[in-house]
Swiss-Prot record:
Gene for this chain: apbA
Biological source species: Streptococcus pyogenes serotype M6 (strain ATCC BAA-946 / MGAS10394)
GO MF assignments: 2-dehydropantoate 2-reductase activity; NADP binding
Main location: cytoplasm
Keywords of the record: Cytoplasm, NADP, Oxidoreductase, Pantothenate biosynthesis
Active site per database record: K184
GO BP, sorted A to Z: pantothenate biosynthetic process
EC number(s) given by UniProt: 1.1.1.169
Enzyme's top EC category: oxidoreductase
Pathway, per record: Cofactor biosynthesis; (R)-pantothenate biosynthesis; (R)-pantoate from 3-methyl-2-oxobutanoate: step 2/2
Function text: Catalyzes the NADPH-dependent reduction of ketopantoate into pantoic acid.
Location in the cell: Cytoplasm
The name this protein goes by in its record: 2-dehydropantoate 2-reductase
Cystine crosslinks: none
GO annotation, cellular component aspect: cytoplasm
Length: 307
């Protein structure tokens, strides 16, 4: 199969690297010039659990011409519409497009560009880091769940899960992936934005009495909005999942902290807490915590003059 990685940041590099170890062709797509040049000149340098340099083709999305068998979307949420526009030429009748982006509502965007028949939605707990252009740090283990959006095309989902398992990516075909997507979004909604605003680690947030109270209110808002949309969510179970995750990740600054505080980049807040607030408004459900957090993050972006 010919597999394109659409958005070759840290996670894209992880998936591209691991899939390249199977009998499948991988092409990385990205728009970051320094990253593209580094990989073209020196290969992708992998550190962490393995130390290796691999030669992988990389190009801008608009430069890709060969029809894809599989495209895995790892672009930033706000760049998704442009990416989908740029890759339209490599999507054939049977091309599978797997979305593994963090956050909520991406399927609505994808449907504007790609038929339901071709769309797979998923969620992953793999992690990865970039140490600079062309350098990926891959440590630890993870897994992912995915599902075909077209109930009459579940074979496509099983084929993709098999391919990813050959790459040791621990994929499971999930008959109902949406609750897992919401659960992961809730983890991000409780930790990412709050730690970015408070300039703290996940452990520091959860050690604070007021921080913990805020976390539980955010979880409640995610659950009531998700349930109103028909998603099967259990507040007690999700609260426990968030708490367990906070213990494992206690010493980490989450990705939004890296974006906002460390690197002064725009965040994906509109697709996490902001998405819950927007959905809540449409459903007539008040979500004051998600609304305030979204406004605070946007205010911080403005204060830092992030464009």
């Amino acid at each position: 199969m010919l597999v394109y990685i659409a958005g070759s940041g840290a996670m894209g590099c992880r998936f591209g690297y691991q899939i390249s170890k199977t009998n499948n062709d991988v092409i990385l797509l990205d728009n970051w010039e320094d990253h593209i040049n580094a990989i073209k000149e020196n290969g992708l340098v992998v550190t962490g659990d393995v130390e290796e340099t691999v030669k992988l083709p990389i190009m801008k999305p608009t430069e890709a011409t060969q029809e894809a068998d599989l495209i895995i979307l790892f672009t930033k949420a706000m760049q998704l519409p442009q990416m989908l526009q740029d890759i339209k030429g490599i999507i054939g009748k049977e091309t599978k497009v797997l979305c593994l982006l963090n956050g909520l509502g991406h399927e609505d965007v994808i449907r504007q560009y790609i038929p339901e028949h071709n769309i797979l939605m998923g969620v992953t707990v793999w992690t990865a880091g970039l140490e600079g252009p062309g350098r990926a740090h891959l440590q630890g283990v993870g897994a992912l769940n995915l599902q075909s959006m077209d109930p009459n095309n579940q074979d496509a989902g099983h084929q993709v899960a098999d391919l990813l398992n050959k790459a040791n990516l621990n994929a499971t075909y999930d008959e109902n992936v949406v609750p897992n997507i919401w659960r992961k979004a809730c983890v991000n909604g409780t930790m990412n934005s709050t730690c970015a605003l408070l300039d703290c680690t996940i452990g520091e947030l959860f050690a604070s009495e007021d921080g913990l109270k805020m976390v539980k209110e955010i979880i409640h808002e995610f659950v009531i909005v998700g349930q109103a949309e028909g998603v099967e969510l259990n507040e007690e179970e999700i609260t426990q999942y968030v708490m367990d995750t906070s213990v494992r990740a206690a010493h980490h600054y989450p990705s939004m902290h890296q974006d906002l505080v460390q690197n002064h980049r725009l965040t994906e807040i509109d697709f996490i807490n902001g998405a819950v607030n927007t959905k809540g408004e449409k459903l007539g459900i008040n979500t004051p915590y998600c609304r305030m957090i979204t406004e605070l993050v946007h205010a911080k972006e403005a204060v830092l003059n992030i464009q």
